[in-house]
Design a protein with these regions (language model features):
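PAPS-dependent sulfation machinery
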Residues: 29-111, 116
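Anion-recognition interface
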Residues: 48-49, 53-71, 86, 117-123, ...
Length: 329
């Protein structure tokens, strides 16, 4: 089974798709691997990892709170890193995921780290036969879901701009990939016609469809903690689409569409016959003034802390990485 990478914006259904694929007998997909972001660099692709840096990476992984969410015994992999003098970046990444794969008694592995879309060039150099699945969701539902999980995301103009930008970046990365190795899936299609959509994904991944994939929710508590949406602990429900129609105010709908309407239409999402008012423009300006610096600070702070943690071989000290699954693998 070729490695499968799921990418997308936050709150777009990446976890749902991960759990569906993870319910297949041949594929194991752990929690997010943002902790690998500092290592997915061309200098490591060319020169590999060796000496003191490799030792620090082993220590970094051992205490990383996000890696702990993978919920398996990684001690053998950590020991193997400590016993080596050098390792290629491919062997490190492949070995890490294979160690999880073996613990799950699966034949192949995948990844669900939405932000890896920024590193697709490096990932495809590491794994030329990898399959990339981009899952997209109506941005207005993304905004509504995100602000429910994190009150600091309650800036409709900022989220609309970020959603539009990230999809542009994903599209730009995917444009360099041959058609047979990339696929775009709408979250809404996954809910409306699950059997057909999942069968198509299986064909793309080169694996047979298994009915057990539709019962993914029966084992969700082995693979995700309660910090995720409650929806992934139950069966697929088409009613969970397009909630923005009831939850967003008219002003929020006007603003989101004014900022990202072109992208909504491109992916066949409904748009309304509304135009931004002067009061909306002022609201967006206040949104951007307050929300953009906050979002930029959050992103920069997280990146800096992870980079420092790798170099020091310690914990990044990040908070709110999530809760452990209820059941141990």
């Amino acid at each position: 089974v070729n490695p499968v990478f799921i990418v997308g914006t936050q709150r777009s259904g990446t976890t749902l798709l991960r759990l569906i694929l993870n319910a297949h007998s041949e594929i194991a997909i752990p929690e997010e691997a943002n902790f690998l972001m500092p290592l997915l660099k061309r200098k490591y692709l060319r020169g590999g990892l060796r000496g003191d840096l490799l030792s620090r990476i082993a220590s970094y992984l051992q205490v990383n709170p996000q890696f702990k969410l993978w919920n398996y015994d990684s001690s053998d992999f950590i020991l193997s890193l400590r016993s080596r003098e050098n390792i290629s970046l491919r062997d490190l990444v492949d070995g890490l995921f294979l160690s999880y794969c073996r613990a799950m008694n699966k034949a192949g592995w995948g990844d669900k780290t939405p932000s890896f879309f920024r590193k697709l060039d490096v990932i495809l150099d590491l794994f030329p036969d990898a399959r990339i699945i981009h899952i997209i969701r109506d941005g207005r539902d993304v905004f509504d879901s995100w602000r429910k999980m994190d009150p600091t995301k309650n800036y409709v103009g900022v989220v609309a701009l970020e959603w539009r930008y990230k999809i542009w970046k994903i599209e730009k990365s995917l444009a360099e990939i041959p058609d047979g190795r990339k696929m775009t899936v709408r979250y809404e299609d996954l809910l409306e016609k699950p059997r057909e959509t999942v069968s198509g994904i299986c064909d793309f991944c080169g694996i047979p469809f298994e009915q057990g994939m539709m019962n993914f929710y029966e084992t969700s508590d082995r693979y995700v903690g309660e910090h995720h949406s409650n929806l992934i602990f139950g069966p697929l429900d088409a009613a969970n689409r397009f909630k923005w129609r009831q939850t967003l105010t008219l002003g929020e709908r006007r603003i989101f569409q004014s900022v990202a309407g072109r992208v909504l239409r491109k992916y066949r999402y409904e748009t309304e016959d509304v135009a931004m008012r002067f009061s909306d423009a002022l609201f967006v300006l206040r949104n951007l003034t307050a929300g953009l610096p906050l979002r930029a600070f959050q992103v920069a702070r997280t990146k800096l802390m992870i980079e420092r943690a790798v170099q020091k071989g310690g914990s990044a000290g990040l908070r709110d990485v999530g809760k452990m699954p209820k059941r141990r693998n």
